[in-house]
Amino acid sequence: MDENQPVAEMPTDLFAVRPDTKGPKTVGVLLLFGAFLLFFQAYGDIGLHNATDLDDEEVGLILDVPNSQGDGNNDISTEQYQTFHDAARESGGYALRGYGLLIASLLLFVGGGMLIFLNGFGAKIALSGASIGLITGIAGSLMVKSAADTHLQGVLLLTYEITTYLCGICMAMCAGIAALPLINTRARLALYPENKVYLANEEE
């Protein structure tokens, strides 16, 4: 081998981690979809908080299924449900969950949009929104469930208990999805390209 022959240099980025631009964009789209769902849930809760008297026909539709599943001894009347509704409003459960999810949906919308454009700050905004939704959603659902435990009976009690669990699970999933671009190395590199690492060659 010719000693004067130049030695081929190893590319500095041969073993570098490649950025993944598709992952953060996919997460952004999922967060936008979740933001729309949260917005409609928040809109419904805020509407319930502002509704002093429920329509008898609407209450009848709500009670039709649970009352039909019992033997008639534990049927819930329209007046009982209205009493529960008033207690849930006075507890602040509807308001806490509604306005909390509204803030969460706005932050998820902004954060998801920023992730689509590969802005790393969007993941942090979305994660904070999901955390707010998780806390306020569970707390508000527990307040509503407490009112249900006091004034309702039968199948509806299970319904409001399941709602609490579902709210917590959905918001925990949103938080997990929002955190993915911050945890995954390739996704984080796409969001923060200035942190790219190169392999250094030292000549002997």
What are the language-model segments listed below?
Residues 2-204:
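Topology signature of small-to-medium multi-pass alpha-helical membrane proteins
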